[in-house]
UniProtKB/Swiss-Prot annotation:
Gene name of the record: VPS26B
Protein's GO biological process: intracellular protein transport
Function recorded in the entry: Plays a role in vesicular protein sorting. Component of the membrane-associated retromer complex which is essential in endosome-to-Golgi retrograde transport. The VPS29-VPS26-VPS35 subcomplex may be involved in recycling of specific cargos from endosome to the plasma membrane.
Phylogenetic placement of the source organism: Eukaryota, Viridiplantae, Streptophyta, Embryophyta, Tracheophyta
Protein name listed in UniProt: Vacuolar protein sorting-associated protein 26B
Cell compartment(s), UniProt: Cytoplasm; Endosome membrane; Prevacuolar compartment membrane; Golgi apparatus, trans-Golgi network membrane
UniProt entry tagged with the keyword Thylakoid: no
Keyword Lyase among UniProt keywords: no
Organism: Arabidopsis thaliana
Length: 303
């Protein structure tokens, strides 16, 4: 029985290393099992190069029908778990059919790779980039090894970045004017603004500003929308008086935000909203939601 079990054990160990692995930045990424691992960070147009090492276990040889390494960009919907939609697929053949008796190393390179989308792990969808090594075998089954990488892409400062101004209210009860300094914010930005009370005829308990993320997956009748409240910031406690102005100052850096994603490969979108919530003394809630655009600014760029 032990002999039979041993027959199905992998015959070799496969490792993947990057050429610039010692100097390349590593970022934390949450795995499917909930644990966090450090993963190398890349950007679109980077060259991805390194070595694949295949080492047979002692006393074993690896008969194979070829060795290849693939760079895959994939989208996985969690309602269709296990099925990946490839939007990037590059292949390098590393070896022709044969046998491996001892440690063998294969260099590989994918030059200036276009990686248009950022890595994203959401509620119902994930977008990932992965290196996949395949040692193709027949009856024994192919041997696979994966190495994930994180992709983040920077955007320039927007040429036009209008402020957001709106008047909202309940007829003859409440009339407010709110203003945010911009409509587009980078991930380390500060939201500045003010809430101005033009008319107050109801007793207010408090007022909060929320950051909400709305993830849409699928299309048409099969669209599924998931909304998360990522931050809640109290602006006011108690009832304001007519003419009162409440300042808004909300730092984005402490929160787990991503850039806005619009219709990624016709599979999903991620949008962000500022949600103004007013609660009166009878616990009735009044909302006003406004979409904002988030983008990733290079860390040495200034706003």
């Amino acid at each position: 029985m032990n002999y039979l079990l041993g027959a199905f054990k992998p015959a070799c160990n496969i490792s993947i290393t990057f050429s610039d692995g010692k100097n390349r930045k590593q970022v934390p990424m949450k795995k499917e099992n909930g644990q966090t691992a450090l993963v190398p960070l890349f950007h679109s147009q980077d060259t991805i190069s390194g070595k694949v090492c295949i080492e047979p276990y002692q006393g074993k040889k690896v008969e194979h029908n070829g060795v290849k390494v693939e760079l895959l960009g994939q989208i996985e919907m969690y309602f269709d778990r296990g099925n990946f939609y490839d939007f990037t697929s590059l292949v390098r053949e590393l070896d022709v059919p044969g046998e491996i008796y001892e440690r063998k190393t294969y260099p590989f390179e994918f030059p200036t790779v276009e990686m248009p989308y950022e890595t994203y792990n959401g509620v119902n969808v994930r977008l990932r980039y992965v290196l996949k090594v395949t040692v193709t075998r027949g009856y024994a089954g192919s041997i696979l090894e994966y190495q994930e990488l994180v992709v983040r892409n920077y955007a320039p400062l927007p040429d036009i970045n209008n402020s957001i101004k709106m008047e909202v209210g309940i007829e003859d009860c409440l009339h407010i004017e709110f203003e945010y300094n911009k409509s587009k914010y980078h991930l380390k930005d500060v939201i500045l603004g003010k809430i101005y009370f033009l008319l107050v005829r109801i007793k207010m308990k408090n007022m909060d500003l929320e950051i909400r993320r709305r993830e849409s997956t699928g299309a048409g009748a099969n669209t599924h929308v998931e909304t998360e409240t990522l931050a809640k910031f109290e602006l006011m406690d108690g009832t304001p008086v007519r003419g009162e102005s409440i300042p808004v100052r909300l730092f984005l850096a402490p929160y787990d935000l991503t850039p806005t994603h619009r219709n990624i490969n016709n599979k999903f979108s991620v949008k962000y909203y500022l949600n103004l919530v007013l609660v009166d003394e009878e616990d009735r809630r009044y909302f006003k939601q406004q979409e904002i655009t988030l983008y990733r600014l290079k860390e040495d760029a200034s706003s």
